[in-house]
């Protein structure tokens, strides 16, 4: 079992209280052997301040992140790597799994650094549209020509060169 839970806190008191509560709840679970096995990989991490907590969180890129602080909205603004974030003391992970409408198919093993969870947006085909006006092609044209030349894609370079000449001759 590779599941784990990680508590990052600035409070030794909270760390102790959580450890005691986990033991109490574990004893009541019908599948306590499985849960206990998952807890073998779990950690209680004491940090000096919120900055360190966020640094660790963003480096770890959790699949699920529960933020239970007084200023959880401010903290949430600093989260850059997480699959799904649960805000405040009334928002358990199980709400996201079953009822709140967010996604349950999330990036694991730190992949939240690069990927989002699967959502309806994952199945929507997107089309991008571009229009470059004369001022725009004059501004970016030389850079495009240089990049295309460096990649030895002469036709790409010429596609811009022809347009720049057409603007000059009009």
Task: Name each region found by the language model.
Residues 58-170:
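C-terminal core of ALDH-fold dehydrogenases
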Residues 7-10, 46-47, 87-88, 100:
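Short beta-strand-to-turn element immediately C-terminal to the catalytic PLP-Schiff-base lysine
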Residues 12, 50-52, 72-73, 120:
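Residues at or immediately preceding the N-termini of alpha-helices
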Residues 8, 12, 43-46, 109, ...:
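Hydrophobic alpha-helical scaffolding
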Residues 1-40, 44:
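A conserved active-site cap/scaffold subdomain adjacent to cofactor or substrate pockets
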Residues 26-66, 70-71:
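Glycine-rich, Lys/Arg-enriched anion-binding loops that position phosphate/diphosphate groups
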């Amino acid at each position: 079992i590779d599941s784990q839970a990680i508590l990052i806190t600035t409070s030794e008191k909270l760390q102790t209280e959580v450890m005691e509560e986990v033991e109490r709840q574990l004893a009541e679970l019908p599948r306590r052997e499985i849960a206990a096995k998952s807890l073998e990989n779990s950690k209680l991490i004491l940090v000096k301040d919120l900055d360190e907590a966020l640094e660790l969180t963003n480096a770890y890129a959790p699949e699920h992140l529960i933020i239970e602080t007084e200023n959880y909205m401010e903290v949430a603004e600093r989260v850059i790597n997480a699959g799904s974030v649960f805000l405040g003391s009334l928002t358990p992970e199980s709400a996201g799994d079953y009822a709140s409408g967010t996604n349950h198919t999330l990036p694991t093993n730190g992949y939240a650094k690069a990927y989002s969870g699967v959502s309806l947006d994952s199945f929507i085909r997107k089309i991008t549209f571009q229009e470059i006006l004369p001022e725009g092609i004059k501004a970016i044209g030389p850079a495009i020509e240089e990049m295309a030349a460096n990649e030895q894609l002469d036709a790409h370079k010429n596609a811009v060169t022809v347009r720049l000449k057409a603007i000059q001759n009009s």
